[in-house]
Amino acid sequence: MLDVNSFDESKIDWKPLPGPDGDPAEHISLSILNVDDKAKIVDVLFKFSANEKILMHRHTSNYSTFTVKGELKTYLPNGELKDVRPAGVFKAGEPGEAHTEGGGDEDVVVYFSLRPYSATDPIYEILDENLEVLQAMNFEDLKGLNEEYSS
């Protein structure tokens, strides 16, 4: 049986995720676990702050998530709570609507397998308050970030 309380995140090397302005985005950190250059898949642990929301965004490629610790809350652009995924929940997703995410009463740690299957097609679009694209992030961007953080 999965013991959702035993995950020791102190072993994770958390790094900031640069926002559209180049400064670290609020309420989010990441640890890139693997970059598969052949298949164009990136495996990442994200940590979202408790009772906070990350940047508004849209997934533009296939992905899978697994909530490792805490609970992942997903919100619609109007702020309405759309979904709650506690530790132990897996979800396979496709490109979809704009949303934001965050932790519940504690920080949430979520494993994402990002699957653009292309070096240049976007994985995410970061959106402004009018849902206009501020920044697109693709496989090469995450690969470069991984190389920067690994050096």
For each feature predicted by the language model, list its residue ranges.
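Short, well-ordered beta-strand segments in beta-rich or mixed alpha/beta enzyme
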Residues: F46-F48, V68-T74, E101, V110-S113
